């Protein structure tokens, strides 16, 4: 059984959440009513807590609150960016040096980090049927070309090339320009060789007609033709989203790959300039405008840039298509800040009618649904363009280079790109003062059998292959990341007795060796991979309400404040036979996707997946707590990831804070032993069990059920039918996760605390082979540390469910609790 079937069958998956279409929600209602109470004798609230009077859907209100916090932080982002910059306007050199750290951070988050191949002249591409000379225009010739970009990562995968058109002037070039089309325009459209772009917007040939050497790269489009796994299935994810999902996991991006292609063209231009120096420019529209802006921000060799149909306020980037999702972008970089990285060079912003994208391609029989459904593109509002340009002006004024920033409005921001005004400004800033020649007649394509889809497929497949090579290489990158921590281990030459005995002496008697050696790694993972919010800023202010009175335990709803608008909520089951002064072990029982605390802690709910495991543990004498995690509401909760990523946050930024506050409060209860609190989660709760305890020391052990697997493979595979690439769970992507951690590395961070995996052999989450492959590294590590008895895996004859046999024994043993309570 896979996750999708789990959702279809779970008792809570089909309930109507009734979430408002607005992102804003009403404050928590204070109804003053009481939950169901078995009899009048139990206390209506826990000692030391206020009455919980909030009514309504707690999960809905939790997700609403996170939305509120993210909207507020998004609104505040632009005002807080100066804290991340240290501009020095003393001179051009000092300024460039002062913004260099920001430029390098930007290079990292767009994934333009691989060293490019040495500059080489583009090669002509053709055959007997399709010769490389495509056409002859007014003063220039058009060739099909390919140029090298990135070398192979590993031996059995190729590198990355760019393909497109070269417009070579008949005379010595007066400038060299990369003309970047929108994603849905082919190079031929931008030159006028194919229909689809108005004559006035065929700006690539306008540069060639005026004596420029022009390269026009292919940009991957927004169709979904190749988005899938042949023989398994195809999705409606745009090509750009398909590439985004897998590349994000290895710290790369479809944007970064295309930046590299453009900058490889600039490499060649620069080499050509060794013969005779002429200015270098980049001009782009729509997606090409984004790429032009990003390239100019990264490369000082570009003298002047035109950005058309893109430049505007960028705080709402989460509303744009997901393939524009860049980790931490809005936190540090609006379009104005990127313009400041172009200084002291020149920028022309053309306010023009932008590409209109209303969502991904429609799902259909041969391309099933799975694409991120939110994300649209529309013409940048003129007032937004103007405001962002005005935000950028002080940066240029700081170096007394106000004239290097120009705004051109094409028909009040609604006109076509490539206007005469924009071209004149660009030519002037490139130092070309001759009058613009009138537009010539579009050239005619001499190729009779040219298929642009074959070229697109080649380029798309190359990007997929290059990314898969990076994924194959990621274990080595993780090894490099962990090298310092691993150096704390004893090596063979230090052994004076068998390894497990030596390691036992070093590790189990001094666990701080490992904790201290990995502190910087844990901080890095929290801050750079999951995104770190400050520790809870509000007092817990606990409110409780009795809801269950069962023969062996009482049940209370619990609400705790975490941050403004964000709270933690769950159900606490307290055994009745706890003696005064006794402190019991506690188990935090975490539900899965679309779940609720009631699924695990309500004796009347008979779930095929959870089997009342919080109830059963409470009946054994454990204190149990079932928290609500915010992965509920389908698309409404997934938007949290869209909103959070530009702020360098994620869904788990909030889950970690909620668990941190919960552990702090739970450990203070007079009937709980704070040193004996375990976490046991199913499915998405298993994700929690792998991600949270490595970073929160308050958990004494962790059990991952119905989730453990080789996570990098799971999220990026183009071979497996279980790949997340084929599904709608786009929120599973974490930036550069694969080069930093996998499940084994996260599990090892739990050590020396106990860790266990529970695995049903018919669980469709992953195959036993892959589960064993990843868990085997954990078993080896615990053995190497001399504590092999603190980890285990149980395979049972079942599906995506809590088994509760070996795991219950594991809890009893490692939380120091006796046999099941028979009272």
What are these regions (language model features)?
Residues 87, 185, 217-260, 283-290, ...:
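Aromatic-lined carbohydrate-binding surfaces of glycoside hydrolases
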């Amino acid at each position: 059984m896979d996750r999708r079937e789990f959702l279809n069958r779970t008792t809570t998956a089909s309930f109507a959440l009734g979430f408002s279409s607005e992102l804003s929600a009403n404050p928590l209602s204070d109804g003053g009513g009481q939950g169901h109470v078995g009899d009048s004798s139990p206390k209506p609230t826990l000692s030391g807590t206020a009455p919980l009077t909030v009514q309504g859907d707690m999960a809905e209100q939790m997700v609403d609150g996170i939305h509120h916090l993210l909207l507020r932080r998004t609104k505040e982002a632009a005002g807080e960016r100066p804290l991340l910059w240290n501009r020095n306007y003393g001179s051009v050199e000092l300024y460039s040096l002062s913004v260099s750290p920001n430029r390098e951070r930007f290079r990292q988050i767009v994934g333009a980090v691989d060293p490019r191949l040495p500059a080489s002249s583009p090669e002509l591409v053709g055959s007997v049927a399709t010769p490389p000379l495509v056409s002859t225009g007014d003063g220039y010739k058009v060739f099909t070309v390919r140029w090298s970009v990135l070398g192979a990562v590993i031996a059995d995968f190729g590198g990355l090339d760019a393909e497109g058109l070269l417009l070579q002037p008949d005379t010595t070039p007066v400038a060299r320009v990369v003309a970047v089309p929108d994603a849905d325009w082919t190079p031929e459209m931008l030159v006028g060789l194919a229909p689809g772009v108005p004559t006035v917007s065929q700006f690539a040939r306008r540069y060639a007609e005026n004596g420029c050497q022009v390269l026009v790269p292919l940009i991957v489009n927004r169709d979904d033709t190749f988005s899938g796994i042949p023989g398994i299935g195809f999705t409606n994810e745009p090509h750009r989203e398909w590439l985004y999902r897998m590349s994000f996991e290895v710290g790369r991006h479809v944007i970064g790959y295309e930046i590299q292609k453009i900058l490889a063209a600039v490499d060649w231009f620069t080499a050509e300039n060794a013969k005779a120096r002429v200015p270098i420019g980049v001009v782009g529209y729509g997606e090409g405008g984004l790429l032009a802006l990003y390239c100019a921000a990264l490369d000082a060799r570009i003298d002047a840039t035109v950005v058309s149909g893109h430049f505007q306020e960028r705080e709402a980037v989460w509303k744009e298509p997901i393939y524009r999702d860049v980790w931490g972008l809005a936190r540090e970089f609006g379009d104005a800040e990127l313009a400041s990285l172009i200084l002291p060079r020149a920028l022309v912003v053309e306010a023009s009618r932008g590409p209109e994208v209303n969502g991904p391609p429609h799902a259909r029989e041969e391309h099933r649904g799975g694409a991120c459904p939110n994300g649209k593109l529309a013409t940048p509002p003129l007032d937004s363009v103007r405001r962002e340009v005005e935000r950028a002006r002080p940066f240029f004024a700081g170096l007394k280079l106000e004239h290097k920033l120009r705004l051109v409005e094409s028909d009040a921001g609604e006109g076509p790109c490539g206007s005469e005004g924009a071209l004149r400004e660009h030519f002037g800033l490139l130092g070309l003062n001759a009058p613009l020649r009138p537009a010539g007649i579009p050239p005619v394509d001499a190729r009779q059998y040219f298929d642009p889809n074959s070229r697109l497929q080649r380029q798309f497949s190359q990007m997929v292959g290059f990314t898969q090579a990076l994924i194959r290489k990621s274990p080595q990158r993780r090894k490099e990341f962990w090298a310092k921590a691993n150096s704390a281990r004893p090596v063979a030459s230090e052994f004076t007795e068998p390894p497990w005995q030596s390691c036992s002496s070093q590790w189990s008697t001094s666990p701080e060796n490992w904790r201290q050696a990995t502190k910087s790694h844990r901080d890095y993972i929290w801050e750079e991979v999951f995104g770190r919010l400050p520790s809870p800023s509000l007092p817990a202010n606990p409110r409780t309400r009795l809801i269950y009175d069962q023969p062996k335990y009482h049940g209370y709803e619990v609400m705790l404040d975490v941050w403004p608008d964000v709270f933690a909520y769950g159900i606490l089951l307290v055994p009745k036979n706890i003696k005064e002064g006794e402190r019991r072990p506690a188990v935090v029982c975490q539900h899965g996707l679309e779940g609720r605390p009631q699924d695990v802690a309500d004796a009347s709910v008979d779930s095929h997946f959870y089997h009342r495991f919080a109830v059963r543990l409470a009946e054994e004498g454990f204190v149990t707590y079932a928290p609500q995690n915010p992965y509920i509401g389908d698309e409404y909760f997934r938007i949290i990831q869209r909103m959070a990523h530009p702020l360098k946050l994620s869904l788990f930024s909030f889950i970690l804070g909620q668990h941190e506050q919960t552990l702090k409060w739970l450990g203070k209860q007079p009937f709980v032993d704070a040193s004996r609190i375990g976490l046991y989660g199913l499915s998405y709760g298993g994700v929690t069990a792998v991600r949270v305890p490595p970073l929160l020391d308050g958990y004494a052990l962790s059990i991952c059920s119905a989730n453990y697997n080789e996570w990098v493979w799971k999220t990026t595979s183009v071979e497996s039918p279980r790949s997340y690439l084929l599904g709608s769970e786009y929120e599973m992507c974490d930036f550069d996760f694969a080069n930093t951690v996998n499940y084994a590395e996260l599990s090892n961070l739990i050590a020396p605390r106990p860790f266990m995996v529970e695995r049903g052999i018919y669980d469709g989450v992953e195959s036993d082979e892959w589960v064993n492959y990843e868990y085997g590294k954990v078993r080896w590590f615990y053995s190497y540390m001399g504590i092999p008895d603190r980890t285990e895996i149980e395979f049972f004859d079942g599906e995506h469910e809590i088994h509760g046999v070996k795991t219950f024994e594991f809890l009893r043993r490692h939380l120091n609790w006796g046999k099941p309570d028979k009272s």
